[in-house]
Amino acid sequence: MLLKHYLKLHTLPRIEGASIFSSRNNVDLLFHDQTIKVSRKRTDGNFWKIFDFRFLKGRPLTADDEKNSNYVAVINESTQKKLFGNKNPLGAFIELEGQPFRIVGVVPDVPALCDRPFADVWVPLSTAKTKAYLKDGVFGDFNAVVLAQNRADIPLIKKEYSERLQRLDYPVPEPWTYAKGRMETYLEIGARSTLNKKGYLDKTYANKFRIILLIGVFIFILLPTINLININLSRILERSSEIGVRRAFGASTRVLVVQFIVENVLLTLIGGILAFGLSWGILQVFNTVDIIPYKNLRFNFLIFFFGFAITILFGVISGVYPAWKISRLHPVAALRQGAM
């Protein structure tokens, strides 16, 4: 395996650990007279140290399990319920592609959106039917992940990986003449995939992706703000008579502006509360629809708080200009405009 034996990922500086694991494969699982389709993933022992699994029962796969080719397996909660109901599955044997595995652990379902750790059943790498995965090759059915000690160490780790790749003494098969690759964060992987730059591994597209997202969010917020300004201006113009009377009795521009801004913020608060309830309801309904396996969409109150704060800010902005403009009208002009 190129990553493990030639690049020696586990010796990279300032990392907590490195793991190599297979892509997931859909296979038949047999248990007594039951047969179900499951996603299987082969892992090493470090896989369970890098990804944050919570064990409901039993233990994870270990380095010894991989070294000794122990036929043991970890299953998810849904697979346990399908096969065992409320019974304890630890110690029971299941069959995958003709191979018997003893269940040693149970974990909560991993959402399919978490592509790297996701599976229904996890077994040791070394239990593969053939040892072809140990042979040298450029392409394979495996992934690698590295856990940095600190976020600040990521650039150093990437640099060391790139330097090792350049010094690589590896027989690159024809027609290729060199090996090319990079270590990427989830954001960088998503950015390159979204921007259709899958073959461009010489640079990162994360910053470009961030800028595009920020521009999109800005436009998404700006357009409703412009609409709100127009709506507020029309609404306030309808109250020209009221404004004219209040100005005639000595109401200052500041008092009128504050009044209309407060009214606008209150309306925004009501809209935000309605949006909160609607969003929560949609999430509950979406969680009951079996579109994404094992999804568990939860309401993120921190994101909602920031979104709500931005909404209030733009609510204030959309109320300032109309309120300031109408409050500057002469009382007589305001009364005439209201009478028209």
Regions found by a protein language model. Give the residues of each.
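Residue-level signature of transmembrane alpha-helical entry/exit and packing/kink sites
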Residues: 211, 255, 299-307
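Structured, solvent-exposed hinge/loop segments at the ends of secondary-structure elements
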Residues: 1-88, 96-101, 288
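Mid-to-C-terminal secondary-structure elements
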Residues: 46-60, 71-201
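Hydrophobic alpha-helical transmembrane segments of multi-pass inner-membrane transport and secretion
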Residues: 202-241
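Generic structural signal for small/hydrophobic residues in well-ordered secondary structure
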Residues: 1, 9, 15-18, 48, ...
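C-terminal membrane-exit region of the final transmembrane helix in multipass inner-membrane proteins
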Residues: 302-340
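Transmembrane alpha-helical interface segments in multi-pass membrane proteins
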Residues: 222, 226, 233, 241-287, ...
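Membrane-interface helix termini and inter-helical loops of multi-pass transporters
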Residues: 288-294
